[in-house]
Amino acid sequence: MSAFNEERVLSVHHWTDKLFTFTTTRDETMRFSNGHFTMIGLKVNDKPLLRAYSIVSANYEDHLEFLSIKVPDGPLTSRLQHIKVGDTVIVGKKPTGTLLIDYLLPGKRLYLLSTGTGLAPFMSIIRDPETYEAFEQVVLVHGVREKDELAYHDLVTEHLPQHEFLGEMIGKQLLYYPTVTRESYRTMGRVTDLMASGQMFDDLKLPALDVANDRVMICGSPGMLQDLKTMLEDKLFKEGTTSKPGDFVIERAFAEK
């Protein structure tokens, strides 16, 4: 029995010349938790060429969605960026990952800290009703170089608050904090610097990080992961695992290149 399903591309959207989103059909046997990633790819010379991708879509949706960078000489992304509606993509049948609420201890506030395509798993998490039942407040932080790379900005700010089922919870409980490093924008700076200086908390009118109340998920570049891990551990946060819940979790299966 194959470890993969063949799915058909339903839509493709290019945010910039370096970033794109695509959706595919979803095999009815595909099961995952919000925050999971899976292996996806293309057949090249009859062999699967695969990489780990977080699933953007929520686990109750009838399609799958992924967010990808474009690497000109990347073995997979150099090909994947040219996919069109109707093309076939291979999707792994065994999603996994550490960015699950189950791996966090109970708390009042959940911080979702991302850079670049690290936003992807958090898009499914903020569309999960259980997220808002588990936490009083959810803070989505997305750091990018240029403002056009703020994928899903309009979905988060305009469409989700109007969502038929989630709109009320999202309107009351979700805070969105986009930041840009290389262009003029209302919030500028690296996520780590904005946290270390306290500016992020001032901007959001929130108290400083407190292990008694706050829980954190992190997905992004290797440097950002390490810097935030150090920052949190200095504040006595303990990292959670699949076997022992903690105060923060990190997705290490991939980091954007």
Name each model feature, range by range.
Residues 115-121:
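Ser/Thr-glycine-rich phosphate-binding loops at phosphate-binding pockets of nucleotides
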Residues 35, 118, 221:
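Short, conserved phosphate/pyrophosphate- and ester-handling motifs at nucleotide-, phospho-/glycolipid
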Residues 2-3, 141, 148-257:
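Reductase modules of NAD(P)H-dependent flavoproteins
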Residues 2-85:
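Ferredoxin-reductase
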Residues 38, 89-92:
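Generic structural signal for buried aliphatic residues
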Residues 110-113, 217:
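Conserved beta-strand elements of the Class I
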Residues 46-53, 96-104:
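Short, Lys/Arg- and Gly-enriched loop/turn segments at beta-strand edges
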Residues 121-131:
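Histidine-anchored nucleotide/phosphate-binding helix
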